């Protein structure tokens, strides 16, 4: 069994959609980034790539490449899954946390989980997503941005 860790953070700005786990969440701000800036999926992808010793999302989907501009991170997650399969790994589980002062994310977590399950072709019970705040402290607590952390385990076939 192998373990991978992922982390991502993006700045909250006006005139952008807030996409987390492939879900568009109603909010007055969204995350700034080259793609859709989905910090949850970016952290998950980095944890999976790390567990398989395949680098990180910047290596596979560089922000200098215009073909990834505005792309859905669900599509990128599907591409990561192809790499995992090609390299003969099986996903055992994923555990992630989203750190955001606002908006409240609990109502969207089940849909996020379903989106990830579908993109990776794994069962719902192999995925856990939590949301928390920093109690008004720091970058996310000050509502300047949103971050996410993910850990996963994979097994070599």
Curated annotation (Swiss-Prot):
<keyword id="KW-0479">Metal-binding</keyword>
<feature type="binding site">
    <location>
        <begin position="132"/>
        <end position="135"/>
    </location>
    <ligand>
        <name>4-CDP-2-C-methyl-D-erythritol 2-phosphate</name>
    </ligand>
</feature>
<dbReference type="GO" id="GO:0046872">
    <property type="term" value="F:metal ion binding"/>
</dbReference>
<dbReference type="GO" id="GO:0019288">
    <property type="term" value="P:isopentenyl diphosphate biosynthetic process, methylerythritol 4-phosphate pathway"/>
</dbReference>
<protein>
    <recommendedName>
        <fullName>2-C-methyl-D-erythritol 2,4-cyclodiphosphate synthase</fullName>
        <ecNumber>4.6.1.12</ecNumber>
    </recommendedName>
</protein>
<feature type="site" description="Transition state stabilizer">
    <location>
        <position position="133"/>
    </location>
</feature>
<dbReference type="GO" id="GO:0008685">
    <property type="term" value="F:2-C-methyl-D-erythritol 2,4-cyclodiphosphate synthase activity"/>
</dbReference>
<feature type="binding site">
    <location>
        <begin position="8"/>
        <end position="10"/>
    </location>
    <ligand>
        <name>4-CDP-2-C-methyl-D-erythritol 2-phosphate</name>
    </ligand>
</feature>
<feature type="binding site">
    <location>
        <begin position="34"/>
        <end position="35"/>
    </location>
    <ligand>
        <name>4-CDP-2-C-methyl-D-erythritol 2-phosphate</name>
    </ligand>
</feature>
<dbReference type="InterPro" id="IPR036571">
    <property type="entry name" value="MECDP_synthase_sf"/>
</dbReference>
<comment type="pathway">
    <text>Isoprenoid biosynthesis; isopentenyl diphosphate biosynthesis via DXP pathway; isopentenyl diphosphate from 1-deoxy-D-xylulose 5-phosphate: step 4/6.</text>
</comment>
<feature type="binding site">
    <location>
        <position position="42"/>
    </location>
    <ligand>
        <name>a divalent metal cation</name>
    </ligand>
</feature>
<comment type="subunit">
    <text>Homotrimer.</text>
</comment>
<feature type="binding site">
    <location>
        <position position="8"/>
    </location>
    <ligand>
        <name>a divalent metal cation</name>
    </ligand>
</feature>
<dbReference type="InterPro" id="IPR020555">
    <property type="entry name" value="MECDP_synthase_CS"/>
</dbReference>
<feature type="binding site">
    <location>
        <begin position="61"/>
        <end position="65"/>
    </location>
    <ligand>
        <name>4-CDP-2-C-methyl-D-erythritol 2-phosphate</name>
    </ligand>
</feature>
<comment type="function">
    <text>Involved in the biosynthesis of isopentenyl diphosphate (IPP) and dimethylallyl diphosphate (DMAPP), two major building blocks of isoprenoid compounds. Catalyzes the conversion of 4-diphosphocytidyl-2-C-methyl-D-erythritol 2-phosphate (CDP-ME2P) to 2-C-methyl-D-erythritol 2,4-cyclodiphosphate (ME-CPP) with a corresponding release of cytidine 5-monophosphate (CMP).</text>
</comment>
<dbReference type="Pfam" id="PF02542">
    <property type="entry name" value="YgbB"/>
</dbReference>
<keyword id="KW-0456">Lyase</keyword>
<feature type="binding site">
    <location>
        <position position="139"/>
    </location>
    <ligand>
        <name>4-CDP-2-C-methyl-D-erythritol 2-phosphate</name>
    </ligand>
</feature>
<dbReference type="InterPro" id="IPR003526">
    <property type="entry name" value="MECDP_synthase"/>
</dbReference>
<feature type="binding site">
    <location>
        <position position="10"/>
    </location>
    <ligand>
        <name>a divalent metal cation</name>
    </ligand>
</feature>
<comment type="similarity">
    <text>Belongs to the IspF family.</text>
</comment>
<feature type="binding site">
    <location>
        <begin position="56"/>
        <end position="58"/>
    </location>
    <ligand>
        <name>4-CDP-2-C-methyl-D-erythritol 2-phosphate</name>
    </ligand>
</feature>
<feature type="site" description="Transition state stabilizer">
    <location>
        <position position="34"/>
    </location>
</feature>
<dbReference type="GO" id="GO:0016114">
    <property type="term" value="P:terpenoid biosynthetic process"/>
</dbReference>
<keyword id="KW-0414">Isoprene biosynthesis</keyword>
